[in-house]
Amino acid sequence: MANRFRFGTIALLATLATCTVAQAEKPVTVAEEEPAPLVIAVRNRDFATARAMLASKPKPDVRQTTSDGTTALHWAVYHNDVDLVERLLRAKADVNARNDYGATPMSEAAVIGNVKVLRLLLKYGADVESPNADGQTALMTLARTNNVEAAKLLIKHGANVNAREQWRGQTPLMWAAAEAQPEMVQLLVDHGADVNARSVVNEWERQVTAEPRMQARPSGGFTPLLYAARKGCLGCAKILVKAGADKDLTDPDGVTPLLLATLNFNFDTAAFLVDVGANVNKWDTWGRSALYAAVDMNTLPTGGRADRPSLDKTTGLELIEKLLKAGANPNLQLKLFPPYRSLRDDRGADTMLTVGTTPLIRAARGGDIPAMRLLLEYGANVHLPTVRGITPLLAASGNAASPLDTRGRYRTEEQAIEAVRLLLAAGSRIDERDELGQTALHGAARWGWNNLVKELVAHNIDVWAKDKQGRTAADIAKGTSTASGRASIEPHPETEALLRKLMAEASPPVASATP
């Protein structure tokens, strides 16, 4: 069932290849398929003919099948005709008949969810498990719904609440949590479902493909609480935690329920997990903590909008504050470049946010002033750089960023100026440089932000500072292009003119040499 918005729940395979009445525009007549006239009659909803056949002498073979192994009982269950189901069972129809697709009357009845039909089938000896070809039991099918009455009936007749399907090793409890069915979760927990069961862990072989970027593959290994966290089922999470679910049990990538809830904008569920003592400082394989994720999600552009507001009562900013109050370390840094997300126009271009990125750098990149204030209040380090030498000040100024980036796409110059002021007041050095030797002024020039240029100059930044290629901020404002001719930095004539003017007004200091 599991991606990250993380892995999707496995879909039910079609249990009956002919289960749609409108499968063929021209219905098959009884005469056209003589070997199974009763099956054809029921399939075509010719219930009067079917009842007449059952009442006739000699009686028809109620175990007859069509070419795919489907019986009249299969179709009677599918059409939810309780009376016809009972007539067929009294006539000794095979209650456990399995067609070529692994479907039994019981597995189909679980899809329909009619308790009367289920009770009849069980009365006549149906296998309460009735797994399909993938090992999905009748209880698993019901667990995805809120049909608690039907599930109780199966459990009363011995259905295994800890059975696993063969595809991903998922249990009924996992299905219930993944589909946000708290009443079903409670029922399964009350009858002994394992709250810490884990689905199959996928060991993907390393492969080299024509696609140059690393591709994520579902790692599996989800617990019921991880499914609830991904779905944002707060009620499910409360039940599972009360029943003893491990709040910090991770998937193979180190993703905790708290982190997963946050990554999926499920802030109410994340806040609950913080309140019940989840470890706020656990990070995953990439070094993402819940705090980093909360800051990231708070201004993440999706769907062409500046952000995608969560439908939860808890806001992203409230979650950030809750995490900080609970002791979240504001200075944890990314260990690896984080995986791509299913985001609009996200092609992994956010290369600035790489190894060493802190929540403060991410907030500065997005111009998230409220989050920056909170992080600084709780001790965020303004000097910690990424491996590319990007500090919070340089991130705020736009260094190493691109219009192709996902994060910070809708940041404004006004936000950048406010972020710079905040950071300088908190101790950032105006002369900080990245791995290219560029200063915050180079970043402002990259974006053509004249007011930011003036703000930096007002704080005595060196307008003559050159990067490792000997370029001043004015040179950057002139624009650059790659060997193919595609502009990597758009030209900003007004910004270049402003910088040339400022350079003329300030004598080049001796220290303005290329670093």
Model-found features: residue ranges?
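Bacterial N-terminal signal peptides
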Residues: G8-T18
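N-terminal segments that cap or nucleate solenoid repeat domains
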Residues: K26-W75
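Ankyrin repeat A-helix N-terminal signature
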Residues: I40-N44, W75-D81, E108-N114, T141-N147, ...
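Ankyrin repeat domain, specifically the short helix-to-loop turn at the C-terminus of the second helix
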Residues: L54-P60, E86-D94, R119-D127, L153-N160, ...
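Start-of-repeat signature of ankyrin repeats
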Residues: E34, G69, G102, G135, ...
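Ankyrin repeat boundary/linker residues
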Residues: T66, N99, N132, E165-Q166, ...
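Leucine-rich solenoid repeat scaffolds
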Residues: V463-A504
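Conserved ankyrin/ankyrin-like repeat signature
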Residues: T49, D83-L84, K116-V117, E149-A150, ...
